[in-house]
């Protein structure tokens, strides 16, 4: 690890409170800041790792302690600027979208009957020549009313807008950022707090560390990073508390927001983007969140965020402001220059007025005026030109490659890059490690919500018991045949319908998945395979419960071998249904839409399965849907399992009349009719003559093409097919980029 971080790791030192010594130094520097009003020293990852004990002999450990002592004694009380600073510059960013506008051929006549059909395209400019600069150690805030372009600018800087649509230049230390490198050295915190509800704060951050920190880093050091981050985020008292949701009490809104930030900065990124991190929070919680962001910036990061309306205290933490109005810059610069700017514009800020609030109110008034904010935009251009000419620009002569290399040597980037194009890893961990972590997290979250699986298991058991009592011990009569067909059709369709619960499960994880994969926390393939594997035990339990509660009670044939095939058919039906519903959950975006689509499609599958109408009677123009029906194959499989014995008789001579108007006549009359039929047909048909065997029933149902084992394997193949489709759906549909 010394090659990666450039420093040695001394033995762990703790104080009387059991906290690492670096935390005390961290606190002492904070106290110095209070007395001397200097910037605070923040602990980078390399400094953190210095406090973690490595295995080695006593001599090596003593040497490490000496190195650590020299290191900490050299840290000044005020923050020392990095010798290789990062500067993110953006120039003339322009982004527009095409929107549909209704075309009215006769606007003077009001609404036209053609309004809904004839459309013309209109261009809306969301960003119009936005320029600026953010430096390491600084916090930049983007302000403006709703629709001003705040989130769009953050998305543009965070590489969340396709390069084909965005015009302008975005550089880091003068060099254009490649998309792959951008994902490694930056992080993006969404406006919504997307977290697993039943994981604790500590577990959430630990799983994030296992995803984002490389496998070469020991478990002990990952835990140390998590503990330091918990202290940095001010979450020590909530570390063992679950995140919570509507049905489970958990952390507060401010704590939840800080956890969201922590999951994205676990790898100590150079650039941190945040979309309105204070929205929905009270003033105290909002201030604490921004205070945490200030510490992150002072540890050597560039922090850029959109914010709706900062308070006076929050304004004092910010280094740069950009005010936007309908995609145009109306102010950019330091918060301290804000009064001077508006004073020179002719609208001085009153002494006791909240400066950002005054600015936003003035911008809204100008937007409602006939001329809009054009005068303010032009004044800002002149003012910026004058400010730029009167100030000496601070340029960095350090190349991006050298700056990143120096950053890695300080431990700032654990999964970073020493080469701008090829030497860095796209993902921090190998495929199998990602699978294990994803599976472990999903199992832990599900285990703390046993009621979800319990309800599903209960539904299967109740359905099985109802079917068992309705179809109790079916006999081998014509009526028993029809009842068997009904039982199998309902049983197979039930297995598919009970899989609909997979829709809300993935939809709840969708945005967590999109956030994590947007910056290469793990591969989409490892996510799909992990969730496929962990779903199998639940399907086995459900299948065993259903088969055990129905097979013997209904009186199905085949003995132990028949039971095993029935069980495996139920299992493959659950598997195919679960895969199909999982695929649909990746396509639809709303729970109710998903349920509607699933119910409709499964109804069509049942309709064309061969139960309501046999294959031979389905019209040719619909026969293709019969072969696409997921219910067809398990349904035909269990029918063959039940009726494949050619020696077993289901209808004897006297039973021929059971399902006809002659079914109620006396037995003697039936025997007389059989004798008459025998004379006409030339075949001796007695009361005990077998008229219909199981093979005859299969022929009547049109089930002669595929063997029962092939039906089983086709059902399994359908499950794999939909899992592959699910993967490609995630691959295509989770790009997280605007067009």
Swiss-Prot record:
<feature type="transmembrane region" description="Helical">
    <location>
        <begin position="487"/>
        <end position="507"/>
    </location>
</feature>
<keyword id="KW-0472">Membrane</keyword>
<keyword id="KW-0813">Transport</keyword>
<feature type="transmembrane region" description="Helical">
    <location>
        <begin position="593"/>
        <end position="613"/>
    </location>
</feature>
<keyword id="KW-1133">Transmembrane helix</keyword>
<feature type="transmembrane region" description="Helical">
    <location>
        <begin position="563"/>
        <end position="583"/>
    </location>
</feature>
<dbReference type="InterPro" id="IPR017871">
    <property type="entry name" value="ABC_transporter-like_CS"/>
</dbReference>
<comment type="similarity">
    <text>Belongs to the ABC transporter superfamily. ABCG family. Eye pigment precursor importer (TC 3.A.1.204) subfamily.</text>
</comment>
<feature type="binding site">
    <location>
        <begin position="144"/>
        <end position="151"/>
    </location>
    <ligand>
        <name>ATP</name>
    </ligand>
</feature>
<feature type="domain" description="ABC transporter">
    <location>
        <begin position="88"/>
        <end position="351"/>
    </location>
</feature>
<dbReference type="GO" id="GO:0010345">
    <property type="term" value="P:suberin biosynthetic process"/>
</dbReference>
<dbReference type="GO" id="GO:1903825">
    <property type="term" value="P:organic acid transmembrane transport"/>
</dbReference>
<dbReference type="InterPro" id="IPR050352">
    <property type="entry name" value="ABCG_transporters"/>
</dbReference>
<keyword id="KW-0067">ATP-binding</keyword>
<dbReference type="GO" id="GO:0140359">
    <property type="term" value="F:ABC-type transporter activity"/>
</dbReference>
<dbReference type="GO" id="GO:0005524">
    <property type="term" value="F:ATP binding"/>
</dbReference>
<protein>
    <recommendedName>
        <fullName>ABC transporter G family member 20</fullName>
    </recommendedName>
</protein>
<dbReference type="Pfam" id="PF00005">
    <property type="entry name" value="ABC_tran"/>
</dbReference>
<dbReference type="GO" id="GO:0016887">
    <property type="term" value="F:ATP hydrolysis activity"/>
</dbReference>
<dbReference type="InterPro" id="IPR013525">
    <property type="entry name" value="ABC2_TM"/>
</dbReference>
<dbReference type="Pfam" id="PF01061">
    <property type="entry name" value="ABC2_membrane"/>
</dbReference>
<keyword id="KW-0812">Transmembrane</keyword>
<feature type="domain" description="ABC transmembrane type-2">
    <location>
        <begin position="433"/>
        <end position="643"/>
    </location>
</feature>
<dbReference type="GO" id="GO:0016020">
    <property type="term" value="C:membrane"/>
</dbReference>
<keyword id="KW-0547">Nucleotide-binding</keyword>
<dbReference type="InterPro" id="IPR027417">
    <property type="entry name" value="P-loop_NTPase"/>
</dbReference>
<feature type="transmembrane region" description="Helical">
    <location>
        <begin position="712"/>
        <end position="732"/>
    </location>
</feature>
<dbReference type="InterPro" id="IPR003439">
    <property type="entry name" value="ABC_transporter-like_ATP-bd"/>
</dbReference>
<feature type="transmembrane region" description="Helical">
    <location>
        <begin position="528"/>
        <end position="548"/>
    </location>
</feature>
<feature type="transmembrane region" description="Helical">
    <location>
        <begin position="452"/>
        <end position="472"/>
    </location>
</feature>
<dbReference type="InterPro" id="IPR003593">
    <property type="entry name" value="AAA+_ATPase"/>
</dbReference>
